[in-house]
């Protein structure tokens, strides 16, 4: 029997609770009038509060994954247009101290290509949230070179790591990434597990006719390593005209393949604002082999109604959604002498304009102008 895994997509809180336009107006009023201590939260018109900040540290990458970047011809941002270390840390401090951010995820491009990454993580780890806790710090990486730096990154304050791996077949890895580097990624997964950054999460984008055959082998591999595999529906973020809604491999199709090998049951822990729906898996041929797998169904079962993310690009702009067509620049204001409160106000305004959903299925949907490598995962 095939397990039915999802209910209908969750609407934004505003719609879910039947909030009126007047309620939204009061939310906006509160968002722009800080309390006595001068702090705000990043709230939008639908009552969603951003607690998770994705910080892209570079648009550069040492792979050329087919669904993310062209093989050649992509120009990198000039250094002077990107935030320097002090600017990155200042904006992170504003986000944490003044705007209620509690989790920071460093992304790219490939964040391990950022010089002084350990210093940026250490500076972030020194901050305390509005609850008096250490900021939770995570890293999303392709894994190349991570094994050689994992000890220093953990010492600096890194709590957790996500490693991208779409196949464990060597030939298919070369075809997907246009680089022969699989052994380096596998070494980094081993190093992250050994360093105790649990759970080490493995991100795999599933593409039609490309790596569907890797679904079960990836699951077996990740379970053997004690890491948590998360399958991701391919989204319209790569080279234009490559993605077609009708051709994508859906969450249901991924789970159907998993059920050929495993018994699946919903994880009991609450999902909250997490993007992945978690499933406990048991090997049908050996019940002693167990693990947990996540499915991120951003297209077929969007979780926009519970999204708690804000995004800072490497050139200092705020994106309130991965698929937003508009951005709010902070870099120039920062370099022109804006105060922390003024930058926080700009940031709050950007998040207020967040739409109820990503709109992938809307008529007239346009994918972002930036490639994924320049937005940050």
UniProtKB/Swiss-Prot annotation:
Pathways involved: Cofactor biosynthesis; molybdopterin biosynthesis
EC number: 4.1.99.22
List of residues binding [4Fe-4S] cluster 2: 304, 307, 321
Residues engaged in binding [4Fe-4S] cluster 1: 61, 65, 68
Top-level class of the enzyme under EC nomenclature: lyase
Chain residues that bind S-adenosyl-L-methionine: 67, 109, 164, 235
Keyword Metal-binding listed: yes
Cofactor note: Binds 2 [4Fe-4S] clusters. Binds 1 [4Fe-4S] cluster coordinated with 3 cysteines and an exchangeable S-adenosyl-L-methionine and 1 [4Fe-4S] cluster coordinated with 3 cysteines and the GTP-derived substrate.
Molecular-function GO term, any one: cyclic pyranopterin monophosphate synthase activity
Biological-process GO terms, alphabetical: Mo-molybdopterin cofactor biosynthetic process
Residues covered by region (Disordered): 1-29
Keywords, alphabetical: 4Fe-4S, GTP-binding, Iron, Iron-sulfur, Lyase, Metal-binding, Molybdenum cofactor biosynthesis, Nucleotide-binding, S-adenosyl-L-methionine
Reaction(s) this enzyme catalyzes, per UniProt: GTP + AH2 + S-adenosyl-L-methionine = (8S)-3',8-cyclo-7,8-dihydroguanosine 5'-triphosphate + 5'-deoxyadenosine + L-methionine + A + H(+)
Domain Radical SAM core: 45-271
Cofactor(s), names only, from the UniProt record: [4Fe-4S] cluster
InterPro entries: Aldolase_TIM, Elp3/MiaA/NifB-like_rSAM, MoaA, MoaA_NifB_PqqE_Fe-S-bd_CS, MoaA_twitch, MoCo_biosynth_MoaA/MoaC, rSAM
Function: Catalyzes the cyclization of GTP to (8S)-3',8-cyclo-7,8-dihydroguanosine 5'-triphosphate.
Similarity field: Belongs to the radical SAM superfamily. MoaA family.
HAMAP family per UniProt: MoaA_B
Subunit structure: Monomer and homodimer.
Protein name, per record: GTP 3',8-cyclase
Organism: Corynebacterium glutamicum (strain ATCC 13032 / DSM 20300 / JCM 1318 / BCRC 11384 / CCUG 27702 / LMG 3730 / NBRC 12168 / NCIMB 10025 / NRRL B-2784 / 534)
């Amino acid at each position: 029997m095939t397990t039915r895994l999802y209910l209908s997509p969750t609407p934004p809180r505003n719609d879910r609770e039947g909030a009126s336009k007047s309620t939204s107006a009061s939310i906006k009023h509160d968002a722009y009038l800080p309390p006595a201590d001068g702090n705000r939260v990043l709230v939008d018109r639908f009552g969603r509060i951003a607690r998770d900040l994705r910080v892209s540290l570079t648009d550069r990458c040492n792979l050329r994954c087919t669904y993310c970047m062209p093989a050649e011809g992509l120009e990198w941002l000039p250094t002077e247009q990107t935030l320097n270390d002090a600017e990155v840390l200042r904006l992170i401090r504003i986000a944490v101290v003044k705007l209620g951010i509690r989790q920071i995820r460093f992304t790219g491009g490939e964040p391990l290509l950022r010089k002084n990454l350990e210093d940026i993580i250490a500076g972030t780890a020194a901050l305390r949230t509005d609850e008096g806790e250490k900021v939770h710090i995570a890293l999303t990486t392709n894994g190349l070179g991570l094994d050689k730096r994992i000890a220093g990154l953990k010492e600096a304050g890194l709590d957790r790591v996500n490693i991208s791996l779409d196949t464990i077949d060597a030939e298919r890895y070369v075809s997907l990434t246009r680089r022969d580097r699989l052994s380096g990624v596998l070494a980094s997964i081993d190093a992250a597990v050994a360093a105790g950054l649990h759970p080490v999460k493995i991100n795999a984008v599933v593409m039609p006719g490309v790596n569907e055959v890797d679904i079960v082998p990836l699951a077996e591999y990740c379970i053997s390593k004690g890491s948590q595999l998360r399958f991701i529906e391919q989204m319209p973020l790569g080279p234009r005209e490559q993605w077609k809604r009708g051709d994508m491999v859906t969450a249901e199709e991924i789970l159907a393949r998993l059920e050929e090998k495993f018994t699946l049951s919903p994880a009991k822990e609450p999902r909250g604002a997490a993007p992945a729906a978690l499933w406990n898996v048991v090997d049908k041929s050996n019940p002693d082999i167990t693990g947990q797998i996540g499915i991120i169904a951003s297209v077929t079962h969007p979780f926009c109604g519970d999204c708690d993310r804000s995004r800072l690009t490497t050139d200092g702009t705020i994106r309130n959604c991965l698929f937003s067509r508009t951005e709010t620049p902070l870099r120039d204001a920062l370099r022109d002498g804006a105060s922390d409160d003024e930058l926080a106000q700009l940031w709050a305004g950007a998040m207020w304009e967040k739409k109820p959903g990503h709109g992938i299925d809307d008529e007239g949907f346009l994918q972002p102008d930036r490639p994924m490598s320049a937005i940050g995962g």
